[in-house]
Amino acid sequence: MKYDAIKYIQLLVSLCILVGSLTNEVQGNLSSGIKVKSCLELFYTSNKTLTNGHYAIHTGLSLTPVYCDFQSDPPYVWTLVESFSRNRGIQTSKLPESINFRKPYYYNYPYNECTPQFQAYRLSHASMKSIYDSPRTTHWRATCNFDKKKKYPISHRDYMRVENCRYNIMAIYNAQPGCYIVDYVNVRGYTCKMCQLPIYVSPSYHVTFLSSRTYSYCQKWKFPSEYGFNPPESNFGYFSQYSIDHECSSSKDATTNYWFGGVYQPESKLISYKLL
């Protein structure tokens, strides 16, 4: 009888720990009665002390686990929608299901959707669209090796940020190349702000930015490249050819990370930020 009582107490303690964990996981979500659809919406409904990590948001009728970045890029808050290693993202990869990381977001190729991580992860098209279409989502960005960052805010070396209204990453699936205004891009230390640059995508390969071809297209901005024109250097995905000086392709385990998000701007207090 005494043994049963001890087991019962242990069970109650375990349940309390679990419920506490879940409450932290979805705070500002179920607890407030608001069905948040992105990490940015979660931040608006929280106590603003959230740290980077795994949370749950609503995508459609269900809760979806996601990785949130609240700290690296103020005043932006980001939801991770895809991440893959160079080994998986390279166009000739033979790894199982590597095709999932060679498709534009127009197509549904989820991978490890219930376990967000950085080596091989992609949300379903429906979950991506739910985050992308949420009212506060205004931008998408690409980063490199985010899982290896130890200090915030992060450096903006090998980083790209684009406004959704300038390039609809969920809808465009065939552009060879298209010229689009990019808010900010840095490749191997070379930066361009509010530039019109070529972004490539096709039904058979992931959206990518070919820095070595920028001097021939659009505004003809030059990103010095060790490869020159042929073969072109792929950045932030596709990786038909790549440079080990670009952080996303610096090693076989280097990761490329895609995010949807926007600026956190509390209505009660206008904050002045110098946006990159």
Map each language-model feature to its residues.
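Mature extracellular or lumenal effector domains of secreted proteins
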Residues: 2-276
